[in-house]
Amino acid sequence: MINKGNFQSVLSKLGFTKKKGSNVWSKSFPSRKCKLEVDFEHERLVYPKELTVYDETTSNFGHPENFVVFECVHRLLEKGYRPEHIELEKRWTLGHEQKSGKADICVYKTKTDEEQKMLFIIECKTAGREYQGAKKTLIEDGGQLFSYWQQERGTEWVSLYASDFVDGKVTYVNDIISCLDDKNVELMAKKDSSVHLYKNAHTAVELFEVWSETYAKQFHSN
């Protein structure tokens, strides 16, 4: 598990460097003209100003999951995603009981004042028991990810993500579910009414049923 005790080693492995005369570690992303920083003195995770953070509790050392979110954002920036297209802790009201849910990471395909198109939603967990429990729940009933998907029906992917630090290496798992109907399955549905599609599902429960019955609970990897 990534934690406060090994976090500096993780950062060093990821290419962060310690600023002279301080306990701040930093890494720049020239192609995106932004940087990530970690302030160990104040125990703060500092994200680019262009990136939207809805809940500042994700920016402290208080929860081990925050380190996973930070590592995942680093991976996204490394892959070239724009910081202004990333949001942390986006909140929705879920279900009839008006309970709220917060997605760890949302990445947009388009994000302007006129138009916002979600690309994918990521739920982050610490490696080991927490991740294994979340995956079990995901397979059994869809968990929170399917509720988020229902709120953002335009999203193309949802994923369950965990990262770890083992034997001096940063490792990760990323269980990805496509939210788009397969073209061949759509053709089958035209001939067979028993084949159900995501586009005809109206609730998180129905989305899960389609994933289970039509797509056999298929995961993708990146």
Indicate residue ranges for each PLM-predicted region.
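Short secondary-structure junctions
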Residues: 76-85
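Conserved catalytic cores of phosphodiester-cleaving nucleases, focusing on short active-site segments
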Residues: 72, 103-109, 117-131
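Active-site-adjacent loop/helix micro-motif of nuclease/hydrolase catalytic cores
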Residues: 84, 97-100, 114-119, 128-142
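Short His-Asn-centered micro-motif
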Residues: 89, 108, 124, 160-163
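Nucleic-acid nuclease catalytic cores
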Residues: 87, 129-184
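Short loop/turn motifs at secondary-structure junctions
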Residues: 82, 102, 117-118, 153-157
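Active-site metal-binding core of divalent-cation-utilizing nuclease and nuclease-like domains
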Residues: 20-37, 56-61, 84-116
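Charged, often low-complexity linker/regulatory segments
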Residues: 1-75, 180-222
